């Protein structure tokens, strides 16, 4: 198992699938799954390649979800080894996507083969939902596949997303939920003028600063047992011509909420609008809703995952909702139980991204153990 998962991870890393490119990764996966009895369906939407593969027609349905695309490598000369040439060094496997998340994809394949070989007449169905649009704008990836599946009433019971959830040891953290995400792009209109004649101008920086201060100091909620309090962060502010003697005519800013299940996106929008309307300036906001918070608090999937990790590693796992968003936010609203479990995330998106080779073999065994507990 360890040799096979390593070889597959290397093959995937060597395919330069910078988002939204798939670079043949899904074809490799399809060729691996087809002999195991999977029906393969390619769903191409614009520049994005997706794969829905399924073995079985009945329920319950266990789905592995993941992505073949990776973020750009950055300057290749800053890497110790070429970013798109998988390289083994001192027990680690280096390459872009090693941890996020080609190692997980390889482990899913090997685990599935091992399980199906032992249990050819397993109950229910096993599925794979794979996209090349997770690291990009997430418009034509998982969300479009889910729309297609929902239209034909094809449901998942359980879904394991292979995002790198572990922090210091494989399986030490499992994501059983994620916060929601809401982005606002605001434009504040002023009147440009000379700094020596402020009475003839309207400075959008001065006009909006008190409002931004109030937004930053607002207590949105207290969180709950599963989620921290909702966070508001301004990520960008731009205004001015660059000249020291010109009052700017407008201001643009971007801010983001990461919110708990204690509030909704509509409630946040209403509260922001109420605060801004207290101040006398002209503004416009374009809202981008990135996903609702979701939580898989308990159930067979969480229990099977905790048990499999304990069996393979001997350790208890921590359930967490911390961190950014994932494609789990598109899957959870269908009613599926969703968790995320993958390699250590310390080097993801960084120069010299790498994964521990032994961890890959353990991850495959954990994945197989989850299948064993749910579908054997």
Swiss-Prot record:
UniProt KW Hydrolase keyword: yes
Residues binding Zn(2+) 1: 67, 100, 163
Function: Catalyzes the hydrolysis of N-succinyl-L,L-diaminopimelic acid (SDAP), forming succinate and LL-2,6-diaminopimelate (DAP), an intermediate involved in the bacterial biosynthesis of lysine and meso-diaminopimelic acid, an essential component of bacterial cell walls.
InterPro entries on file: ArgE/DapE_CS, Bact_exopeptidase_dim_dom, DapE_proteobac, Peptidase_M20, Peptidase_M20_dimer, Peptidase_M20A
Keyword Disulfide bond appears in the UniProt entry: no
Enzyme class: hydrolase
Pfam family, one: Peptidase_M20
Segments crossing the lipid bilayer: none
Quaternary structure note: Homodimer.
Any one Gene Ontology BP term: L-arginine biosynthetic process
Pathway: Amino-acid biosynthesis; L-lysine biosynthesis via DAP pathway; LL-2,6-diaminopimelate from (S)-tetrahydrodipicolinate (succinylase route): step 3/3
Gene Ontology terms for molecular function: acetylornithine deacetylase activity; cobalt ion binding; succinyl-diaminopimelate desuccinylase activity; zinc ion binding
Residues the record marks as active site: 69, 134
Protein name: Succinyl-diaminopimelate desuccinylase
Cofactor-binding details, from the entry: Binds 2 Zn(2+) or Co(2+) ions per subunit.
Name of the encoding gene: dapE
Cofactor(s) needed for function: Zn(2+); Co(2+)
Family note: Belongs to the peptidase M20A family. DapE subfamily.
EC number, UniProt record: 3.5.1.18
Organism expressing this protein natively: Pseudoalteromonas atlantica (strain T6c / ATCC BAA-1087)
Catalytic activity annotation: N-succinyl-(2S,6S)-2,6-diaminopimelate + H2O = (2S,6S)-2,6-diaminopimelate + succinate
Keywords: Amino-acid biosynthesis, Cobalt, Diaminopimelate biosynthesis, Hydrolase, Lysine biosynthesis, Metal-binding, Zinc
